[in-house]
UniProtKB/Swiss-Prot annotation:
Organism: Rattus norvegicus (Rat)
Chain residue ranges for the region called Alpha: 31-66
Protein name (record): Metallothionein-3
N-acetylmethionine: residues carrying this PTM: M1
Chain positions recorded as a divalent metal cation 4 binding sites: C34, C35, C45, C49
Function description: Binds heavy metals. Contains three zinc and three copper atoms per polypeptide chain and only a negligible amount of cadmium. Inhibits survival and neurite formation of cortical neurons in vitro.
Keywords: Acetylation, Copper, Metal-binding, Metal-thiolate cluster, Phosphoprotein, Zinc
UniProt-listed GO biological process terms: activation of protein kinase B activity; cellular detoxification; cellular response to cadmium ion; cellular response to copper ion; cellular response to hypoxia; cellular response to oxidative stress; cellular response to reactive oxygen species; cellular response to zinc ion
Residues bearing the modification Phosphoserine: S33
Zinc as UniProt keyword: yes
């Protein structure tokens, strides 16, 4: 399975767990893990935020809070 995709539907469940790198993850069971790189106080993190795992200085940039 491509680590950049997530097979589950909106609100579904999947095996992302703590290693979620899905760009469009909408799984309720791994949303918090997807947003672990968000800064404190980012209200969007609990909604549709997904971390973009890159290397170096751009590592763990958050799609909703950069």
């Amino acid at each position: 399975m491509d680590p950049e995709t997530c097979p589950c539907p909106t609100g579904g469940s999947c095996t992302c767990s703590d290693k979620c790198k899905c760009k469009g993850c909408k799984c309720t069971n791994c949303k918090k893990s997807c947003c672990s790189c968000c800064p404190a106080g980012c209200e969007k993190c609990a909604k549709d935020c997904v971390c973009k795992g890159e290397e170096g200085a751009k590592a763990e940039k958050c799609s909703c809070c950069q």
